[in-house]
């Protein structure tokens, strides 16, 4: 599933290339995504001009003239593709085609059909059923150790599950949760409510750092994710633990372990991420190794 860095990459490209373009027509596949695409969508957005593109967590918010916003979620396999000159042969699994007045087109493709696409009056976005339950966006509101510790107070869920809970932090998914906890030297199985403030401080710092590093490389591509120009992200080559089961840790050479938590794969280093913090760890700040800086 595209996570915050992938969605932010798409957002920046959409903002750069589409703002100012006016929608001439819209064609829908008629197939249901995670929820039905409203039949009224073409009528709602036809004739409107794109005025801005925002993001909250994994949701894209495409603002249109007349105070209307397209709410989009890429789901497991969704992607937005932009064509200055559309291909003659249509691609499979394209569920929406927006044609602009200059002849360029924006396509929403989603093979697995877990995405979301609808239009909402901009003033009603805070009450939207998808957006209203999301926690803060970590790039818009960078977390702090004290803030995360307070949010996790009494939580029995694992540190990994805590990071994945979109009601607490919007945008972190399976790939980056494993990477963040490795960088912070926190065992993903530990109860979130038992982490000390300095440990949460390390998580907060690495969360911001990892997400920004991934954005700089246009995100991570393993199979389906592509940018607006159908290009893959290149952050996969920088991953420390994710999808590296049984390979040596880049920091200490211990084999990386893979476990399953809440039906999702988790990757970690048993040596760098001990199940119990070293004595005094909760009282001193963590340092970064050379592998972390690379």
Write out the residue ranges for each language-model feature.
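Basic, nucleic-acid-binding surfaces and adjacent catalytic neighborhoods in DNA/RNA-processing proteins
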Residues: 22-40, 54, 147-294
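Phosphate/anion-contacting hairpin/loop surfaces
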Residues: 70-183, 191, 198, 204
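Gly/Gly-Pro- and Ser/Thr-rich, intrinsically disordered tail segments characteristic of DNA damage-repair
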Residues: 1-119, 125, 142, 244, ...
């Amino acid at each position: 599933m595209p996570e915050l860095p992938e969605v932010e990459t798409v957002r920046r490209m959409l903002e750069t290339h589409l703002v100012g373009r006016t929608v001439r027509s819209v064609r829908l596949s008629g197939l249901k995504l995670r929820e039905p695409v409203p039949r009224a969508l073409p009528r709602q957005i036809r004739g409107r001009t794109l005025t801005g593109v925002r993001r909250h967590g994994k949701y894209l918010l495409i603002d249109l003239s007349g105070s209307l916003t397209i709410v989009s979620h890429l789901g497991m396999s969704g992607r937005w593709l932009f064509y200055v000159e559309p291909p003659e042969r249509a691609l499979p699994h394209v569920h929406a085609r927006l044609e602009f007045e200059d002849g360029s087109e924006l396509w929403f493709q989603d093979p697995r059909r877990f995405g979301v696409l609808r239009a909402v009056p901009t003033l009603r976005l805070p009450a939207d059923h998808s957006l209203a339950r999301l926690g803060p966006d970590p790039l818009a509101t960078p977390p702090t150790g004290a803030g995360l510790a307070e949010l996790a107070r009494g939580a029995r869920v694992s540190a990994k599950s805590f990071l994945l809970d979109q009601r607490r932090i919007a945008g972190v998914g399976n790939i980056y949760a494993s990477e963040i906890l490795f960088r912070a030297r926190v065992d993903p199985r530990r109860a979130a409510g038992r982490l000390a403030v300095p440990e949460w401080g390390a998580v907060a710092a690495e969360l911001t750092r990892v997400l920004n590093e991934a954005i700089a490389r246009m995100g991570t591509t393993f199979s389906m994710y592509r940018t607006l120009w159908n290009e893959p992200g290149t952050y996969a080559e920088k991953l420390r633990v994710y999808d590296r089961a049984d390979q040596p840790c880049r920091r200490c050479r211990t084999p990386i372990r893979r476990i399953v938590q809440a039906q999702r794969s988790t990757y970690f280093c048993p040596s760098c991420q001990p199940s119990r913090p070293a004595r005094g760890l909760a009282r001193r700040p963590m340092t970064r190794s050379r592998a972390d800086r690379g």
